[in-house]
Amino acid sequence: FLVSDSTGETLDRIYLALKAQFPNNNYKIHHFAFMRTTTQTATLINACKKTENPIILYTLVEKQTTNHIINECKTYNIPCFGILDYLIPQFEKIFNQKATLKPSGQHELNKEYYRKIEAMQFTLQHDDGQKLDTAVDADIIIMGVSRTSKTPTSIYLGERGYKVSNIPLVLHQKLPDEIFSSEAVKVGLTIDPTRLSDVRKTRMNILNDKQSSTYVDMDVIQNEISEAKKMFVSKKIPVIDVTRKSVEETAASIIKIYEIEKEKKQ
């Protein structure tokens, strides 16, 4: 049972990280979002009592609701774990100030929120080589041949407040010089040719495309990747191999490169 006093997004991510360490356990997930009253906790506990071997994970900051769940769990011998219960008191000591204990604090409509909205709008407008004339205004420019996860990686970064432009590299087509001279941090994505061929074949099958034979031709793919690598080297663009990387891992590597490059310019 994933219990939160807000949307539950934070708890979902924590649970996925935890679940990955125990791949053989297939628990059914029950979401209880916006949990802020004892009436709601009663519904939660009743659901737990009807479930075999229930476990509660929660991110709650309001003490009355939290204490009610803890007491009920003790009564009915239900394991429950508060993700923030240990961290908040420790950070209060470190910062020498009391926590606000305000639910949904991370979702306030503040400057940071609107900055992320602006970043996402920019990223969507500059997807797949669109608006090259303003791509130079990006924080990050991602380049790579077709099907190297440029779009999902860009969107992931956009959600985190980075303005991203992603540009497909096409054989025998040069990019404007302004792209390389811009202040944006440039990152190249590459991939194993065999893996790329498989990805493209899957894409063609989904689209029922029988015509684009060169799109999956191994010689063409190897040439595409080779030319892209040469360009990355000549322009001194750091490269990430996405063959065995998830979008999240690729994005984390890009953020690291971004931070390093920004430090160099300070």
Language-model features, listed with the residues they occupy:
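Small-molecule kinase domains that catalyze NTP-dependent phosphoryl transfer to phosphate-bearing small molecules
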Residues: 123-127, 209-250
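N-terminal accessory targeting/assembly segments
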Residues: 1-18
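Internal active-site segments that recognize and position negatively charged phosphoryl groups
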Residues: 117-163
